[in-house]
Amino acid sequence: PARRARLGVGRALQLTNLFPHLTVLENVRLAVQSRAGIGMSMLSLWSGHTEVIQRAEHYLERVALTPKRGALVGTLSHGDQRKLEVAILLALEPAILMFDEPTAGMSVDEVPVVLELIHQVKAERDKTVLLVEHKMDVVRALADRIIVLHNGALVADGEPAEVMRSKIVQEAYLGTPEPA
């Protein structure tokens, strides 16, 4: 994981990889410290690294978790844990962001926050976003290019509208249209 981060690749997976006994802020702070090259010492932060705390709080604000900054991660809902993982991913500032089903397990009101975050990252145009997703509405909302695999084989690659018109994609993922 550390080598991947040094190479500029960050990922947020379906199963969260967090420190459940630390607070929300502490989890993001560790990512900020790692990115800044300060290391992982929890004590070093409290001895004058206020800019690290401010940076961590910035990422919490981006994912709408500021009100939960002092909560232990283990007490968060799955959706909030997913948002926290996105905050950590952003704090690592990778060149490539990989999202595996970024909205899986989230409530209906939590999904727009993460989708908007991914839209913002894409709008900045300085990072590559790779998205693994089975919900076609999410794919259509976020993708500039879609690559579809079916049974381990590449079946489509192109712009969203083109891929969505593909007969094999429709049969495999969208269902065969009902005859009129």
Residue positions per predicted region:
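Glycine-rich phosphate-binding loops of nucleotide-dependent enzymes
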Residues: 1-180
